[in-house]
From Swiss-Prot:
GO cellular component annotations of the record: cytosol
UniProt keyword annotations, A-Z: Cytoplasm, Elongation factor, GTP-binding, Hydrolase, Magnesium, Metal-binding, Nucleotide-binding, Protein biosynthesis
Protein's name in the database: Elongation factor Tu-A
Natural source organism: Pasteurella multocida (strain Pm70)
Binding annotation for Mg(2+): 26
Amino acid sequence: MSKEKFERTKPHVNVGTIGHVDHGKTTLTAAITTVLAKHYGGAARAFDQIDNAPEEKARGITINTSHVEYDTPTRHYAHVDCPGHADYVKNMITGAAQMDGAILVVAATDGPMPQTREHILLGRQVGVPYIIVFLNKCDMVDDEELLELVEMEVRELLSQYDFPGDDTPIVRGSALQALNGVAEWEEKILELANHLDTYIPEPQRAIDQPFLLPIEDVFSISGRGTVVTGRVERGIIRTGEEVEIVGIKATTKTTVTGVEMFRKLLDEGRAGENVGALLRGTKREEIERGQVLAKPGSITPHTDFESEVYVLSKEEGGRHTPFFKGYRPQFYFRTTDVTGTIELPEGVEMVMPGDNIKMTVSLIHPIAMDQGLRFAIREGGRTVGAGVVAKIIK
């Protein structure tokens, strides 16, 4: 089959497999690529190609991740699979592989296990919006009642973490039998693909979201005023539009009187572009790196939040010793460091390098944030942890 060219016409959706070790996540990933390639075209990927995951670096953290892609008639999917449990934790917290939806793999022979629960909880904390369940190894369970029991347990577990357990699609299948080409089990993979197409809504592209530009630099240009530069994170900014300057100090409003890129004037700056924005009547000293320009009312500044954090191990260049409550590192948001103090969950005295932990953070300055914002934890300029805002407190 000749190599197909990448079609930009189909909506692009990011998904991934999650679930307990040895429940069949990688086998399922291989089965999806194989069955969909057979029915709809595209490349099949063998189990060992996926299992042998390359190392990647995200925010200074080493993660083993496999990326595969596949197509259904209506969509193009990018799918991420991780070999080890620690890789999942890091992946989800750093947002290295943002997921529009996840496929939770549960072996019907075991039912939900500790990591099943942990991955669902992590999914809730880091903002995975949709979960579809693949009940695997159903070819090894003859008892219909047992399957129903496992299904019920999974639904209860999802509901416990605020996912709609009763309405979640659950597919009963066998990844291994589908991979081996057994028709009745291949059907189950097509059923799963159909749920991906219908249950996970098309993600909103960055360009369609409200405008946000993290400020990297501020210049004063004589006779013209103040220019801030940075990469537009989302949305579009047009000359003449009103924006808010949010974070660190009290929020203020101003008007963008010009947008430029490589010293050329533009009508607008779009998500992904590095631009300079000329601001009306704003003094150089009123703005600093670490603030954001945003569509008015779209984002607010906060100091206190709950977060899910992964603490780098010594081997990853992290701390060599644990830390305790009252620890005061820097929290790096977008373009700047802000000092903050931490509170640990009840009953947790200390946090070891390599742990993942839920912690409450209180910053000394407010930062423009919403749920799902990623940050790094730093000490003297080196990264010692990565986290995500799970819930804003104030």
